[in-house]
Swiss-Prot record:
Homotetramer. One of its GO terms (biological process) is glutamine catabolic process. The gene is glsA. Gene3D superfamilies: DD-peptidase/beta-lactamase superfamily. Substrate binds at S61, N111, E157, N164, Y188, Y240, V258. Keywords: Hydrolase. It is an enzyme of class 3 (hydrolase). SUPFAM superfamilies: beta-lactamase/transpeptidase-like. This is Glutaminase.
Length: 306
């Protein structure tokens, strides 16, 4: 595995078309696009890394996997009264489908859906309490208490919140948001601003490799059925309106973020985190997607392989 990752990192270093760094969040626009990291964590406790795998980056929408997990843990199937389970086929911040579906988001991995999940898990608590719960959960699944919010990124997103605020207010007008919109958005922007490295992120994804069990502690995070269902949602909805292309080329459940990270799960085999800040036209890491396609070709880890 280490040689495979070394070879992939070397190949990515030669790529000239690295995509475009997200510029609508000013703090992300300053990130050096010439970076690439990859890490694979396996259920036996091994972690293999290559490239800039220890560099911290903003996980952005990858955090939606973690808040959905918290929501399933707290509410069970009742979480699905707040959000659907269907691919949207639209950009992650689109308001179009919301209008047709009476303000109920299509899935928890588009912005509107993730905001609805945050509202659901707040359960009357103040933002500070909910943020503490989210960060403690990430510490637990990654087995790393050093992970923190990047408050500068969160503030940058809050300053440019107009589209997300519109989504939240639209949902609230239909009764799908119960808390104060600014409080919900404050939590949402901070969860997206969690800073992690590829190594930390790969460790954090291991519970989805092992039917919901935290491999660091042996403690169950969610039940096996919930773990399978999160993976299925990652496969269908995890890459914005590029989910079909990712399934076609990589064939694994994954969740991307506009910070350039992708968390990918090979059930029973490994948790893969890749990061390169340059994005393709739908907002997924350009080199990250290429690297994962190479990894699957070299390992045969696609869920569609015999």
């Amino acid at each position: 595995m280490q040689q495979i990752l070394n070879d992939i990192a070397a190949e990515m270093a030669l790529e000239t078309d690295r995509g475009k760094v997200a510029d609508y969040i000013p703090q992300l626009a300053h990130v050096d696009p010439n970076q690439f990291g990859i890490a694979v964590a396996t259920p036996d406790g091994q972690v293999y890394v290559a490239g800039d795998a220890s560099t911290l980056f903003s996980i952005q929408s990858i955090s939606k996997v973690f808040t959905l997990t918290i929501g399933l843990g707290k509410l069970g199937d009742a979480i699905w009264t707040h959000v659907g389970r269907e691919p949207s086929g639209d950009p992650f911040n689109s308001i179009t489908v919301l209008e047709f579906e009476s303000g109920r988001p299509r899935n928890p991995f588009i912005n509107a859906g993730a905001i609805a999940v945050v509202d659901a898990i707040m359960m009357g608590h103040e933002p500070k309490e909910t943020l503490g719960e989210i960060l403690r959960f990430v510490h637990f699944i990654a087995d790393d208490d050093s992970i923190r919010f990047d408050h500068k990124v969160a503030a940058s997103e809050m300053d440019h919140r107009d589209r997300n605020a519109a989504l939240a207010h639209f949902m609230k007008s239909f009764g799908h948001i119960k808390h104060d919109v600014d409080k919900v958005l404050g939590v949402y922007f901070h969860q997206c601003a969690i800073a992690m490295s590829c190594e930390q992120l790969a460790r954090a994804g291991l519970f989805l490799v092992s039917n919901g069990v935290n491999q660091h502690t042996g403690i169950r995070v969610i039940n096996a059925q919930q773990s399978r269902r999160i993976n299925s949602l990652m496969m269908m909805c995890g890459h914005y309106d590029g989910a079909g292309e990712f399934a076609y080329r990589v064939g694994l459940p994954g969740k991307s973020g506009v910070g350039g990270g992708i968390l990918t799960i090979a059930p029973g085999k490994g948790s893969i985190a890749v990061w390169s800040p340059g994005l393709d036209h739908v907002g997924n890491s350009k080199l990250g997607s290429k690297a994962l396609e190479l990894l699957v070709q070299k390992t045969g880890w696609s869920v569609f392989s015999n």
